[in-house]
């Protein structure tokens, strides 16, 4: 029984599904998808639970969320192993994900009060108040790269605001989704407040098509995000928050410490086996001898990266990709770039057939025309050389995406120019592209999102503002507008 609907674990009535470890092939999870009727059932449960949950005081909702945080802490080792085994990422990285889940709760509580709490301004004849109210029933679509942390970034602020939720994890990480749901169950979340439906495309389409849905919060690919945007077009009454991918540029302009710059680049391009939406996909490198030396060192260090299993000792920097198919897609993308005229610098290698263990790839595309403006979700870095910084910024902005952008340079003036001209929601200076602060908004523009950033700003799309003018008594104004006569004279 792998669906959680209205406080009960039930068996899915849709297609059967098996999840295996992408490296070892070990069976980790088996179950059935939710069919359309069960998705409807989950929506009815969420709708029925909404009035009571929304009417609880914030302190009461907060208490449930804090119990969930305590359970994350006490079950950290177990949840770390589940995420690592299911995604293929090393244990050390899965542990950082669970830590991020715990930290996100305190940040979400603070953001609730700062961004969507209550404010009151006294006026001579009363007060002006600002309150926030929950939307109602929200669908949350989770991604596979951070199956705990990223859905958590939607679910926690949505619950704090008083919404009820239907959560669909990625079909590639059903075990992680179920494990997190069981912790919410232990935390004492009332029936119907959070419902879990497993499944792939058909389940997702049934969920997004629900008429009685008040909104949808999505993290995933641009292609799916565009489909959801089209599906919900003409429905302005529904809140839609899309957090999508990127074709992110990293500009290497001047390098004082080559190894430090190489380390930053590897952290930007290859951490999580390149499966972060903020990963550097395009390396823009200044022409010249210094750039040549940097590139040679980058290739030399990158070719030492050997992906391994989640529990290997010593721990590898990267593990496998989410699936063998995902790894093959990266290899295919590399082959297409090479066929277009790209200059191979480091060829990606699938270490073992039937696994997702893929080494990084680096290819130079300077002067090659028609390179697709697409996100390759894996450890593949394309390199372009440039002559002037103005040219580098033009190249950085030459994409339909706009998630992250970075600059390596000792010159503050160049960063200031980039801040003015970059088309990206995250712009970093001498920091990895994959670094982001939860106390700041997380999101992009263009094909990277619909201007609904998450993290610190997630509270914004989880509640709507209600403005009020208030007075505890009613008196006739001492001064009336022209044309108003409240005298006792009788009009004849």
Curated annotation (Swiss-Prot):
<comment type="function">
    <text>Catalyzes the NAD-dependent reduction of succinylglutamate semialdehyde into succinylglutamate. Also shows in vitro activity with decanal or succinic semialdehyde as the electron donor and NAD as the electron acceptor. No activity is detected with NADP as the electron acceptor. Therefore, is an aldehyde dehydrogenase with broad substrate specificity.</text>
</comment>
<dbReference type="GO" id="GO:0004029">
    <property type="term" value="F:aldehyde dehydrogenase (NAD+) activity"/>
</dbReference>
<dbReference type="InterPro" id="IPR015590">
    <property type="entry name" value="Aldehyde_DH_dom"/>
</dbReference>
<dbReference type="Pfam" id="PF00171">
    <property type="entry name" value="Aldedh"/>
</dbReference>
<comment type="pathway">
    <text>Amino-acid degradation; L-arginine degradation via AST pathway; L-glutamate and succinate from L-arginine: step 4/5.</text>
</comment>
<dbReference type="InterPro" id="IPR016163">
    <property type="entry name" value="Ald_DH_C"/>
</dbReference>
<comment type="similarity">
    <text>Belongs to the aldehyde dehydrogenase family. AstD subfamily.</text>
</comment>
<keyword id="KW-0346">Stress response</keyword>
<protein>
    <recommendedName>
        <fullName>N-succinylglutamate 5-semialdehyde dehydrogenase</fullName>
        <ecNumber>1.2.1.71</ecNumber>
    </recommendedName>
</protein>
<keyword id="KW-0560">Oxidoreductase</keyword>
<dbReference type="GO" id="GO:0004777">
    <property type="term" value="F:succinate-semialdehyde dehydrogenase (NAD+) activity"/>
</dbReference>
<dbReference type="InterPro" id="IPR016162">
    <property type="entry name" value="Ald_DH_N"/>
</dbReference>
<keyword id="KW-0520">NAD</keyword>
<feature type="active site">
    <location>
        <position position="243"/>
    </location>
</feature>
<dbReference type="InterPro" id="IPR016160">
    <property type="entry name" value="Ald_DH_CS_CYS"/>
</dbReference>
<feature type="binding site">
    <location>
        <begin position="220"/>
        <end position="225"/>
    </location>
    <ligand>
        <name>NAD(+)</name>
    </ligand>
</feature>
<dbReference type="InterPro" id="IPR017649">
    <property type="entry name" value="SuccinylGlu_semiald_DH_AstD"/>
</dbReference>
<dbReference type="InterPro" id="IPR029510">
    <property type="entry name" value="Ald_DH_CS_GLU"/>
</dbReference>
<dbReference type="GO" id="GO:0019545">
    <property type="term" value="P:arginine catabolic process to succinate"/>
</dbReference>
<dbReference type="InterPro" id="IPR016161">
    <property type="entry name" value="Ald_DH/histidinol_DH"/>
</dbReference>
<dbReference type="GO" id="GO:0043824">
    <property type="term" value="F:succinylglutamate-semialdehyde dehydrogenase activity"/>
</dbReference>
<dbReference type="GO" id="GO:0019544">
    <property type="term" value="P:arginine catabolic process to glutamate"/>
</dbReference>
<keyword id="KW-0056">Arginine metabolism</keyword>
<feature type="active site">
    <location>
        <position position="277"/>
    </location>
</feature>
């Amino acid at each position: 029984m792998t669906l959680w609907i209205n406080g009960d674990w039930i068996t899915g009535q849709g297609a059967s599904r098996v999840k295996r470890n992408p490296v070892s092939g070990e069976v980790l999870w088996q179950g059935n998808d939710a069919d359309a009727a069960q998705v409807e059932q989950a929506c009815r449960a969420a709708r029925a639970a909404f009035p009571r949950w929304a009417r609880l005081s914030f302190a009461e909702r907060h208490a449930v969320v804090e119990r969930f945080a305590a359970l994350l802490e006490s079950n950290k080792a177990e949840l770390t192993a589940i995420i690592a085994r299911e995604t293929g990422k090393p244990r050390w990285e899965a542990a950082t994900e669970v830590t991020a889940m715990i930290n996100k709760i305190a940040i979400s509580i603070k953001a609730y009060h700062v961004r969507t709490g209550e404010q009151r301004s006294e006026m001579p004849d009363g007060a002006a108040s600002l309150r926030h109210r929950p939307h109602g029933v929200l669908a949350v679509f989770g991604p596979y790269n951070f199956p705990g942390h990223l859905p958590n970034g939607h679910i926690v602020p949505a619950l704090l605001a008083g919404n009820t939720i239907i959560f669909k994890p990625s079909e590639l990480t059903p075990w992680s989704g179920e494990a997190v749901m069981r912790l919410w169950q232990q935390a004492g979340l009332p029936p119907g407040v959070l419902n879990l439906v497993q499944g792939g495309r058909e389940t997702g389409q049934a969920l997004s098509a629900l008429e009685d849905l008040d909104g949808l919060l999505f993290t995933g690919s641009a292609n799916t995000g565009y489909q959801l945007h089209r599906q919900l077009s003409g429905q302005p009454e529904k809140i839609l928050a899309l957090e999508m991918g990127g074709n992110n540029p990293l500009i290497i302009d001047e390098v004082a410490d080559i190894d430090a710059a190489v380390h930053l680049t590897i952290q930007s391009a290859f951490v999580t086996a390149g499966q972060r939406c903020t990963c550097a996909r395009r390396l823009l490198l200044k022409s010249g001898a210094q750039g040549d030396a940097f590139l040679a060192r980058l290739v030399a260090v990158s070719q030492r990266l050997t992906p391994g299993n989640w529990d290997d000792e010593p721990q590898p920097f990267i593990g496998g990709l989410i699936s063998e198919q995902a790894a093959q897609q990266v290899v295919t993308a590399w082959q297409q770039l090479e066929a277009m005229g790209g200059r191979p610098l480091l060829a990606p290698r699938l270490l073992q057939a039937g696994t997702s263990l893929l080494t990084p790839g680096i290819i130079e595309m300077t002067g090659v025309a028609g390179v697709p403006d697409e996100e390759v979700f894996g450890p593949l870095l394309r390199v372009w050389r440039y002559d002037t910084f103005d040219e580098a910024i033009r190249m950085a902005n030459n994409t339909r995406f706009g998630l992250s952008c970075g600059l390596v340079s000792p010159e503050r003036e160049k960063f200031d120019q980039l801040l003015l001209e970059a088309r990206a929601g995250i712009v970093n200076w001498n920091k990895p592209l994959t670094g982001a602060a939860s106390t700041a908004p997380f999101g992009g523009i263009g094909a990277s999102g619909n201007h609904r950033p998450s993290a610190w700003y997630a509270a914004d799309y989880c509640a709507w503002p209600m403005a009020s003018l208030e007075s505890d008594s009613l008196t006739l104004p001492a001064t009336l507008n022209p044309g108003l006569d409240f005298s006792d004279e009788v009009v004849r």
